Design a protein with these regions (language model features):
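N-terminal leader/targeting segments and the immediate start of mature chains
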Residues: 2-5, 15, 22-74, 83, ...
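Short, hydrophobic/aromatic-rich segments at coil-to-beta transitions
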Residues: 45-49, 72-77, 143-150, 171-174, ...
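An acidic-aromatic
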Residues: 62, 66-118, 177-189, 195-197
């Protein structure tokens, strides 16, 4: 081989070595996005009934779920199979929690509460700057073949995820939330699931008699987001985090309105709660706290108390909490 041809050949090899991983990465990212789109579609179009186990903080809870989609929207009923048999019913944008142990019913908007199975975004254009996405092979869950997906954060401010998606329907059947050491700190897995043509109406109503229960309803004190009226600044956020919500709301059990702000990168999120605390109530959280995957950090800010909560590392909630200031500071 002549020197010129040898040089050209070596140059071509260098180009292939450099570009092949990029092509493979782009192809796999597209495959992952395809599975996430299928998963999102399944979550909002399928009728199903099943049993799943949810575990965090060393505790396991068994739940039954019934999910229905109609032209009027989605309906869902969650029944705890442990303890006192608490139930949660979702009907469109409203969530009603039935608590027989305290003889109470709490009504809230669904945007404030975590969903089961968990939801994940369909588009990865922005998220790929902060996470690595890959396929991790097939696995059998509750008798169904699933496609595994791994999501690894690129910085210490978010958790990782492993997902197992049912291949035929796209329903998410199993998840692991992974901490900074790549260890599961929260798990969700179906032990049985059946796909239905339709759901009987009686399966979507609570089994308990609530005539003697006390009803509470969380209400926003304003009808729209008050982003332009905020009196507080958040001077640091992890890359990609943007404000999703900024509202004043009344808690279900009463008391003074609380400012509630939500920040998210599309996958991870944190809530910021700010309330008046002129007397510096000793019951309010000071410093860090953890319950399973959920971390929190609280502190005083003048005549206010600030709490930051989220399924993110403790470092994240602490840095955000310490970065909150009043506009007149």
């Amino acid at each position: 081989m002549s020197s010129s041809k040898s040089f050209a050949y070596q140059s071509l090899l260098m180009v292939l070595c450099v570009t092949s991983p990029l092509v493979a990465f782009a192809t796999q990212l597209e495959e992952v996005q395809g599975w996430l789109q299928k998963m999102y579609h399944a979550a909002h179009t399928l009728n199903y009934e099943g049993t799943f186990v949810y575990g965090q903080h060393g505790r396991l809870s068994s739940m039954r779920i019934i999910h229905q989609v109609t032209p009027e929207g989605e309906q869902e009923r969650l029944i705890s199979m442990d303890g006192t048999g608490r139930e949660v019913i979702r009907d469109g944008g409203k969530v009603t929690c039935y608590l027989p142990d305290s003889k109470a019913v709490v009504v809230e908007k669904s945007r404030k509460l975590k969903k089961f199975p968990p939801e994940f975004p369909m588009k990865l254009d922005d998220l790929k700057n902060y996470y690595t996405f890959s396929l991790i092979g097939d696995s059998r869950v509750a008798g169904h073949i699933t496609q595994g997906i791994e999501i690894v954060p690129k910085d210490p401010y978010r958790y990782g995820h492993q997902l197992w998606v049912e291949k035929k329907t796209g329903l998410l059947l199993k998840t692991h939330l992974l901490d900074e050491d790549n260890k599961p700190i929260e798990q969700f897995v179906f032990t049985q699931v059946s796909f239905l043509d339709q759901v009987a109406d009686e399966k979507l109503v609570p089994a308990m008699d609530t005539k003697k229960f006390t009803w509470y309803e969380a209400k926003d004190t304003n009808d729209k987001d008050d982003k332009d009226e905020a009196d507080f600044n958040v001077d640091w956020l992890p890359g990609g985090f943007k404000q999703d919500m900024n509202r004043m709301q009344k808690m279900p059990t009463g008391g003074m309105p609380v400012k509630h702000m939500v920040y998210s990168d599309g996958l991870s999120s944190v809530s910021v709660f700010i309330e008046e605390d002129v007397q510096h109530d000793p019951a309010n959280l000071m410093g860090g706290s953890r319950m399973g995957a959920i971390n929190a950090h609280g502190r005083h800010l003048g005549d206010y108390h600030v709490t930051v909560v989220g399924e993110v590392p403790q470092l994240t909630v602490e840095k955000i909490c310490e970065a909150i200031s009043t506009k007149n500071q």
